[in-house]
């Protein structure tokens, strides 16, 4: 009898495995005894401590909902934790290029939500994993905002975008940093638990760099002062937020938000940062990449990948602020080939969107290769990357979409390079196939 009981004690010990026996596997979640603190054995089945606690929480909520139906609310959403490979594959469907940035983001996001999941099971004497906020560096229109937005959609977590240029220190004209959290709360439909697991993208973060390396007697209310104000919410703290946004006032009721599990992604063009890096890095150590400059941006597309915290400090970010953004990734400028692919390849590519709109009117939309090349050419001239593609197409398509619903018997609309240049309108094909009309 003693020998029969002894293995069961080993099985329920969780992390230990005496006698060289294979680890026990939880029948519910599949975790092994090495991954949990304890394992309870039953007839032909095992259950780990994590599944037990999860079951208790589920039952507690169900009982509470029965006893207090008026207090029943949507349960906190736990993002489905996908592997970095799966996250990147999902990003690939919407974002063209930027392979390095997508890998960095995938790993950072995976570790962030794994950290949240593991926090409840971490003993006080175990290693606590710090938050992996992210800094994206790259020219305008390279996909910084799109990457953050796509990640939030993929994980189905609340998401909001804030413009750093609108932020000022408390007491000055402009937005407090707390307004960022208020927007996230709105995005979560005031579900506090969901908001506390959301993602915030702070754009134009380079614009709050310290204006001068010299200490001034005048306050830098939109530069270093904002960096100091952002520190508190970046590192994780409980912040009182006005539910309707705007400035705080003494008589206003505040909602306390814990930012410990909110992922912050900051992005900026950081114009001139490449020159700071170039001064630090000798030509010999920069290698072959140092001689190749991007035609649109005028800087070496590889040089930003060499950025260090010291470079960012020289640029104007304070060390404490840089330290709150441990994951840094530089995005590549988009060349003509990448812009052309962005037009047609992503799951929600602009060309696909317009084709779907025309399809709703029973008309097939076609872009000639020359037309797409012309769109890319104009976008490159504007110098705003992928952002220019939509404005170029919208400028052309607005008149066509205005008159299309009133045209009869049209089955196909062909956009040519002349259409993009506004030399002539599109070519319409009628349903009988015999008549071609040029607008």
Curated annotation (Swiss-Prot):
Keywords: ATP-binding, Chaperone, Metal-binding, Nucleotide-binding, Zinc
Residues binding Zn(2+): 26, 29, 48, 51
SUPFAM superfamilies noted in UniProt: Glucocorticoid receptor-like (DNA-binding domain) (SSF57716), P-loop containing nucleoside triphosphate hydrolases (SSF52540)
Residues given in the record as ATP binding sites: 139-146
Similarity comment text for this entry: Belongs to the ClpX chaperone family.
PANTHER family: ATP-DEPENDENT CLP PROTEASE ATP-BINDING SUBUNIT CLPX-LIKE, MITOCHONDRIAL (PTHR48102:SF7), ATP-DEPENDENT CLP PROTEASE ATP-BINDING SUBUNIT CLPX-LIKE, MITOCHONDRIAL-RELATED (PTHR48102)
Described function: ATP-dependent specificity component of the Clp protease. It directs the protease to specific substrates. Can perform chaperone functions in the absence of ClpP.
Assembly and binders: Component of the ClpX-ClpP complex. Forms a hexameric ring that, in the presence of ATP, binds to fourteen ClpP subunits assembled into a disk-like structure with a central cavity, resembling the structure of eukaryotic proteasomes.
UniProt-recorded name of the protein: ATP-dependent Clp protease ATP-binding subunit ClpX
Species this chain originates from: Chlorobaculum parvum (strain DSM 263 / NCIMB 8327)
Gene that produces this protein: clpX
């Amino acid at each position: 009898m003693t020998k029969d009981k002894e293995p069961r004690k080993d099985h329920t010990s969780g992390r230990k495995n005496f006698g060289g026996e294979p680890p026990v596997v939880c029948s519910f979640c599949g975790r092994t005894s090495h991954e949990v603190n304890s394992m309870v054995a039953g007839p032909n089945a095992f259950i780990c401590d994590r599944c037990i606690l999860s079951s208790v929480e589920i039952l507690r909520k169900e009982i509470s909902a029965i006893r207090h139906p008026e207090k029943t609310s949507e349960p906190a959403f736990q993002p489905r934790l996908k592997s970095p490979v799966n996250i990147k594959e999902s990003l690939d469907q919407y974002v063209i290029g930027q392979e390095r940035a997508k890998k960095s983001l995938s790993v950072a996001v995976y570790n962030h939500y794994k950290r949240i999941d593991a926090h409840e099971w971490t003993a006080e004497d175990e290693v606590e994993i710090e938050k992996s906020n992210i800094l994206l560096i790259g020219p305008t229109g390279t996909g910084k905002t799109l990457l953050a937005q796509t990640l939030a959609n993929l994980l189905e977590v609340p998401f909001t975008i804030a413009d750093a240029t609108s932020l000022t220190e408390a007491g000055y004209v402009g937005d407090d940093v707390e307004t960022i959290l208020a927007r996230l709360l709105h995005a979560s439909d005031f579900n506090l638990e969901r908001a506390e697991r959301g993602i915030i993208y702070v754009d134009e973060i380079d614009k709050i760099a310290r204006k001068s390396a010299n200490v001034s007697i005048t306050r830098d209310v939109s530069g270093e002062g904002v960096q100091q104000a952002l520190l508190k919410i970046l590192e994780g703290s409980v912040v009182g937020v006005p539910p309707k946004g705007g400035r705080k006032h003494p008589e206003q009721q505040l909602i306390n938000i814990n930012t410990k599990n909110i992922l912050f992604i900051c992005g900026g063009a950081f114009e001139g940062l490449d020159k700071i890096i170039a001064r630090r890095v000798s030509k010999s150590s920069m290698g072959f990449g140092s001689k190749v400059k991007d035609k649109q941006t005028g800087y070496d597309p590889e040089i930003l990948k060499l950025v260090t915290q010291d470079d960012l400090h020289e640029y104007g970010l304070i060390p404490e602020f840089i330290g709150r953004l441990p994951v840094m990734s530089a995005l590549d400028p988009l060349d003509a080939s990448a812009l052309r692919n962005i037009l047609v390849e992503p799951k929600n590519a602009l060309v696909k969107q317009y084709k779907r709109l025309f399809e709703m009117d029973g008309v097939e939309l076609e872009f000639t290769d020359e037309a797409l090349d012309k769109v890319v050419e104009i976008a490159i001239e504007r110098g705003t990357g992928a952002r220019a593609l939509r404005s170029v197409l919208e400028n052309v398509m607005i008149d066509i979409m205005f008159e299309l619903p009133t045209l009869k018997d049209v089955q196909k609309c062909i956009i040519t390079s002349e259409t993009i240049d506004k030399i002539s309108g599109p070519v319409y094909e009628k349903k009988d196939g015999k008549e071609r009309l040029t607008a």
